[in-house]
């Protein structure tokens, strides 16, 4: 899409050199042929270091756009990013793509549907009512149980097991809101990648990234009814127990354990070998590895146990 057309769509005055923009991306990852945005002044350093060809900004952050990068000034960058995301959304299905490629020894139920452009490796088992989307890739020896959906462009590694009714790559919960309180969808144009030797329980949802990838690393174990938000990274051999909820853009180190019904806020970082007891609520990043936490507000587990004992004594005294 030409930058001239983009400027018109988002109502930005621009009179510089026009060139083609191929996709939207983050400030950190965007290249000269890509466009990004900034909706918060706390990302000034990221603006200054960005290699994006163009950045959607407010008048307050325009001055921080580096030379050689086009600043598209608008009143509400987040809203206009949402507007533009629709124009870069790929087709849900593409009939021009080749027929799916199926590896040797793979068994596919006649009641499953495999979209064009998909690739399924050797020795897989694909059961009834499974849908594998356009350009999705399934590795070797992976088992996919009934009614699983793997959306377009998503990748599942080898030796994985995905249980019934799980959804891989549905849209993340992303929308912009204007001054009038109206909402506008942010089209989620990234994907999900699940590395090798991952097992995912029934009725779990892993959302696709806005840009880039939601990543489930090697050896992760995910229980039933777990929600993983867009752009999350779940570290190697981590364990997410039933009804855990991981908000968008949270990054976990390896061997993190999230107990049942525990949850995180978004945009957090959790150190390796951290354990959250059931129903823990994580609102801040955890930098020190190897600790166990419980409760809400979150406390180290031993302090939480002491607090519960004191509360019990107070109740007994009264």
Swiss-Prot record:
Active site, UniProt feature: 230 (proton acceptor)
Keywords, alphabetical: Acyltransferase, Lipid A biosynthesis, Lipid biosynthesis, Lipid metabolism, Repeat, Transferase
Pfam families reported for this sequence: Hexapep, LpxD
EC supergroup of this enzyme: transferase
Tree of life domain: Bacteria
GO CC terms of this entry: membrane
SUPFAM superfamilies assigned: Trimeric LpxA-like enzymes
Transmembrane segments: none
Protein's GO biological process: lipid A biosynthetic process
Coiled coil: none
CDD domains tied to this protein: LbH_LpxD
Catalytic activity: a UDP-3-O-[(3R)-3-hydroxyacyl]-alpha-D-glucosamine + a (3R)-hydroxyacyl-[ACP] = a UDP-2-N,3-O-bis[(3R)-3-hydroxyacyl]-alpha-D-glucosamine + holo-[ACP] + H(+)
Stated family: Belongs to the transferase hexapeptide repeat family. LpxD subfamily.
Known function: Catalyzes the N-acylation of UDP-3-O-acylglucosamine using 3-hydroxyacyl-ACP as the acyl donor. Is involved in the biosynthesis of lipid A, a phosphorylated glycolipid that anchors the lipopolysaccharide to the outer membrane of the cell.
Protein name: UDP-3-O-acylglucosamine N-acyltransferase 1
Protein's organism: Sulfurimonas denitrificans (strain ATCC 33889 / DSM 1251) (Thiomicrospira denitrificans (strain ATCC 33889 / DSM 1251))
Lineage summary: Bacteria, Pseudomonadati, Campylobacterota, Epsilonproteobacteria, Campylobacterales
